[in-house]
From Swiss-Prot:
Encoding gene (name): ntnM
Membrane-topology annotation of the record: Single-pass membrane protein
The organism's place on the tree of life at top rank: Eukaryota
Transmembrane segments: 22-42
InterPro entries in the cross-refs: Cyt_P450, Cyt_P450_CS, Cyt_P450_E_grp-IV, Cyt_P450_sf
Organism: Nectria sp
Protein name: Cytochrome P450 monooxygenase ntnM
């Protein structure tokens, strides 16, 4: 009705312009529009406020109390929230309120186009700030990266040699027991393996690039946390002066200085048929898939580092901790590796056949996913769910990983069972969801639905190749006194960065199997 009035307004104006009248009409329209917007906003907030709030603060309490409570007790707050409402509740975080939904809504929201992961990440990681431009939904880097991950990345499996070289450097050929930091070495190894595919031989062993790709994610995290200490309205003005944010900007420039010459060299080669070469890495694939879309090659590579290095190395570390805690799985794993590699070699088909390894990976991820809240989304349009729960535009939502410990899905869910998913081979209803790369309502570690992690297939191959080399070449165990503890910060769950492993090189092993 209001739109019709605006469309017909020119017909109702007098032929002879009356400037004061026109000004009054314009001001009236603006006032009506403002009142309408305020009324809608108030109504949205009213409907949202009907849901219980966990971690709120009193009138005379500082918001810092809620932030600290969230950062150090998010898990307890989630459990408390579900005692107040089994459907949905609000929770104050270090940045804003998030609407927590019951896992019952997983299938209802998983493919809803009105819910955006990229916009949620942009809000969480301040994508409007130039230093954190990788999180800006307007840059299109997420679409470009998604295309590469889905269409190209798993076409290459030239990773076994790189895994061998990286592991030899980190764990050495020492046949005597020696101590090392598990997670630090996993970050270095995963960075090398990933960079082999991301950047090819030109840069994958470059110490400067490996330092950037290992540090960038951590620096972004600390940069965002440092800037969030300032009021939001000051972010556009103070970000240049925050030391942690400047570090991120400096690293972006370092990445540009390393990657741009490679891109320019390849562009020059492409202009001459005699010097044209074929490359199999993300620099080449991005050029092929761009289809006219502008993108920054350095930012794209840093985006891959954000998505791949620390998430994969964190999970690989946790898997090693679990194998150390349950050493009875080591011999069956080695037997599986030898059997599969003899028949299939280090191929995609071979890696897919490693069912016990796949099960141990998935079980490790079930018990310790990367975060306790998954399926993060920003609501782009007002939505009313099937049972009446209202999701107002502009609010973030998420679903906890409670289903990972639901006894209706898992027998004895608190216990680590390396064969848990192998046993599902005999269950036709769950056979498809048993694979490490499969997503389902009962296993949300990679998300579920439209925004499920597109890099999970590459991560699976990468982890399996690394485990094959580690298990076949080394004996390893927890150092005396090392007791891995899951580190919790806000939603994030991290494997223990302080764990020491004792390792030594095995003797009498046919390592040629690893390169078939």
């Amino acid at each position: 009705m209001f739109g019709d009035f605006v469309e017909k307004l020119p017909q109702k104006l007098p032929q002879k312009l009356d400037i004061p009248l026109i000004i009054n009409v314009i001001l009236s329209i603006a006032a009506i529009a403002l009142i309408r917007a305020l009324a809608i906003s108030i109504l949205r907030q009213y409907r949202l406020r009907k849901l219980p709030l966990v971690n709120g603060v009193g009138v005379f309490e500082s918001s810092q109390k809620a932030k600290q409570n969230f950062l150090f007790n998010a898990e307890g707050l989630l459990e408390n929230g579900f005692t107040k409402s089994t459907k949905a509740f609000r929770m104050a975080t270090d940045d804003s309120e998030v609407l927590i939904l019951s896992p019952d809504y997983i299938d209802e929201i998983r493919n809803d186009k009105r819910l955006s992961l990229t916009h949620a990440l942009a809000e969480d990681f301040l994508g409007h700030i130039p230093a954190f431009v990788n999180f800006s939904p307007q840059k299109g880097l997420n679409d470009m990266a998604g295309d590469i991950l889905q269409k190209k990345l798993t076409q290459s499996l030239d990773l076994s040699t790189e895994a061998a070289l990286a592991l030899q450097e980190q764990w050495t050929d020492n046949k005597e027991w020696h101590a090392l930091n598990a997670k630090t070495t996993m970050v270095e190894i995963v960075a090398r393996i990933s960079s082999r595919v991301f950047l090819g031989l030109e840069l994958c062993r470059n110490p400067a690039w490996l330092r950037i790709t290992a540090d960038y994610t951590v620096n972004v995290f600390f940069g965002v946390m440092a800037l969030k200490k300032w009021p939001k309205y000051l972010h556009p003005f103070v970000w240049r002066f925050v030391p942690e944010v400047r570090t991120v900007r400096d690293q972006i420039q370092e990445a540009v200085n390393l990657i741009q010459p490679v891109v320019e060299k390849r562009t020059a080669e492409g202009k001459s048929p005699s010097s044209r070469k074929t490359y199999s890495d993300t620099i080449q694939w991005a050029n092929e898939l761009a289809n006219g879309r502008p993108y920054d090659p350095a930012l794209l590579q840093l985006g891959f580092s954000l998505a791949a290095i620390h998430t994969t190395s964190d999970l690989l570390s946790q898997i090693l901790y679990n194998i150390c805690a349950y050493p009875e799985y080591i011999d069956p794993l080695r037997e599986e590796i030898v059997t599969v590699l003899k028949e299939h070699g280090m191929t995609k088909a071979g890696l897919f056949k490693m069912k016990l390894m796949d099960s141990i990976m998935k079980e490790s991820q079930r018990l310790k996913p990367g975060a306790m809240l998954m399926m993060r989304r920003m609501v782009l349009e007002d939505i009313t769910l099937s049972n009446g729960v209202f999701l107002p535009r502009g609010v973030q939502i998420g679903i906890p990983t409670r289903s990972h410990f639901d006894p209706s899905f898992y027998t004895d869910p608190e216990r680590f069972d390396g064969y848990r998913y192998v046993k599902m081979d005999d269950d036709p209803q769950r056979e498809k969801s048993r694979h490490f790369v499969s997503t389902s309502p009962e296993h949300l570690a990679f998300g579920h639905g439209k925004h499920a992690c597109p890099g999970r297939f590459f991560a699976s191959q990468e982890i399996k190749i690394a485990l094959c080399h580690i298990l076949m070449k080394y004996e390893f165990k927890l150092a005396d006194g090392s007791k891995p503890t899951v580190m919790k910060m806000g939603w994030v769950l991290s494997s223990d960065p302080m764990v020491q492993l004792m390792v030594r090189k095995r003797e009498g092993v046919d390592e040629n199997l690893l390169y078939k």
